[in-house]
Design a protein with these regions (language model features):
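Short amphipathic alpha-helical segments
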Residues: 24-31, 111, 160
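Second-shell loop/turn segments in exported
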Residues: 21, 105, 126-127
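Charge-biased C-terminal accessory regions appended to nucleic-acid-, cytoskeletal NTPase
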Residues: 212-239
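Conserved catalytic core of two-metal-ion nucleotidyltransferases
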Residues: 29-78
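Conserved nucleotidyltransferase catalytic core and NTase-mimicking acidic/glycine-rich helix/loop elements
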Residues: 113-216, 220
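Extended, alpha-helix-rich binding/interface surfaces that flank or overlap catalytic cores
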Residues: 3, 61-117, 187-190
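Active-site nucleotide-donor binding segment shared across nucleotidyl transfer reactions
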Residues: 1-22, 26
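Extracellular structured ligand-interaction cores
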Residues: 8, 12, 50-52, 60-64, ...
Length: 239
């Protein structure tokens, strides 16, 4: 899905590195930034953020590279580096990626990946609710269970979209107050911390609204009417 005008194609890269004696958390990000800033190709395209170095190129493309230190204190542990606070933060990024891939495998046809992209696109074109991509990925993934594999609820991408948004809306409507939404592979990571009650309530209301629109578009038998109803959700260029 091409980003909206002024938007960017972006990619996230986790760079697994061994610990360097004497380095603090900020050093890993700063050294990575300095490396690219010293390169003739990248020097004018680099920006440093709290956890990553960003390279912007080709006008509408960017890549975020985050150093992740392996085994600094204990074997098989991973930590990302917060340059702003100069602290190491435990992460389970590799396990989280495996979890997402597993949920996508249950849905089949790469449909979870497609649905997640559609919902992120919906966020970007409507601009009336906010949620970080990692939190939405978790919320979507939690709606898919092992027993869903090869069921009619995930027969194709539109059906997967209807099923996932319907289940998500059902869960949201049962939780009027902001719940704790934890990383499914790192229980100490409360991902919902990025929301307050106001943002959560707005998200809850918008998903309920769009759930109704999706159900209506999905059920429409007339082709032209169906296209019009999908365009109400995803914009006039969606067909």
């Amino acid at each position: 899905i091409k980003p909206l005008a002024g938007g960017e194609f972006d990619a996230d890269l986790l760079a697994i590195v061994d610990p360097v004696e004497g380095w603090e958390a900020k050093d890993y990000v700063n050294k990575l930034g300095a490396f690219f800033e010293g390169h003739s190709i990248y020097k004018d395209k680099v920006r440093r953020y709290s956890h990553c170095v960003t390279i912007e190129y080709a006008g509408e493309r960017r890549i975020d590279i985050a150093p992740c230190v392996r085994g600094r204190q204990w074997p098989d542990t991973y930590e990302v580096c917060n340059r702003a606070s100069n602290t190491f933060e435990t992460t389970a990024a590799l396990d989280y990626t495996k979890w997402v891939i597993g949920r996508n495998g249950v849905a089949g046809g790469n449909d979870l990946k497609k649905v997640t992209r559609l919902l992120k696109y919906l966020r970007d074109i409507k601009t009336n609710f906010t949620r970080p991509s990692f939190l939405f990925t978790t919320l979507v993934g939690l709606q898919i269970h092992d027993w869903d594999k090869d069921t009619a609820a995930f027969a194709d991408t539109p059906t997967c979209l209807k099923t996932v948004v319907g289940r998500l809306d059902d869960w949201l409507q049962m939780n009027a107050d902001l719940p704790e939404i934890r990383n499914p592979v790192l229980r100490s990571d409360i991902q919902s911390r990025v929301w307050d009650q106001t943002k959560y309530s707005n998200f809850r209301g918008k998903i309920n609204l769009y759930r109704g629109w999706i159900d209506e578009a999905y059920a429409e038998q007339d082709r032209d009417e169906s296209i019009g109803k999908w365009q109400r959700i995803f914009g006039d260029n969606f067909a």
